[in-house]
Amino acid sequence: LRLVGSEMCIRDRIQLEIGVQSTNGATIREIHRTMQLERLKEVVKEVQKHENIHEHLDLIAGLPFEDYDTFAKSFDEIYELRPNQLQLGFLKVLKGSYMYEHAKEYEIEYHSRPPYEVLKTKWLPYEDVLKIRQVEEMLEVYYNSGQFEITMKVLGVLFKSAFFMFQELGKYYERNGYFGMSHARIRRSEILLEFIKETFAGDITAGEQRNITETGKKADHLEILDIIKESLIFDLYYRENCKSRPAWAKDLSVWKQVTRAYCKNGKQSHVECFSYRFPDKGERVLKELPKRAGKPLYALFDYTDRDPLDHQAKVTWIMEDEDAGLCSH
């Protein structure tokens, strides 16, 4: 990358995988690794500026000197970089490896069959390993899938800790018996909306007080729900022209004239009406919640012009202009 300059790389030809494993200094020293965390962050941000390289960063649960809280801190530090994929794995204790040789010292228990993944350590009890596995599943479904990109950006304004958010979402799945079931994409959206409603509509718990931002505490919960409903609709059409629509979706016939005027590619395009304008692709982190527009906004999703990196449709915003009528931006 240094030789050719990442801006010269052809889009979607390179995938960069960075094995972070942990940001906990004691852990990094114990596994005999050297890492300059701030330098790592600089490199990742430099790569991201050009938006042409798919970057994967990984973390490993079950390493020495890593307990639940320090792992959560590692998770949040790496999540803040918003890589294309944040891969959360579990320590594998392979025969002859350093971890195998020190398993007794670290009080590591692990599966006796492949892939020999950790069950507990001196620092991480079995119960915490199970909780991290729930976080991993929620991360895969709602972040790594790329199917909820805009909604994840909005939730980043509401939650201080992404780890806490995925942890609480996992608890919500467990309470309602949602784990172990096959859920369609729209059902995943419904569950996420249910979770947000439960979190922000009632009294905020002590844990939520610590992990929810001031914006999340002060914002009207109905406004939050309106934004999330629209961001979930945006996410659905960002990837595909959905045949089915969630129950809260607006009636398509309301803007059928706009659809006729702008949808020139049949099923390869779609127009949706929004009250909020959502961030452009290059804006990985939102600083504030989207603001309600004074007039209806229309997003034109063009599936003939997809981003080769994430396969999302090209989006053109269409706004009402007093003099010119509808105009695209």
Indicate residue ranges for each PLM-predicted region:
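Radical SAM enzyme core and accessory elements
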Residues: E137-H329
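C-terminal catalytic core of tyrosine-transesterase DNA break-rejoin enzymes
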Residues: T27
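Generic structural motif
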Residues: L1, T23, T304-R306
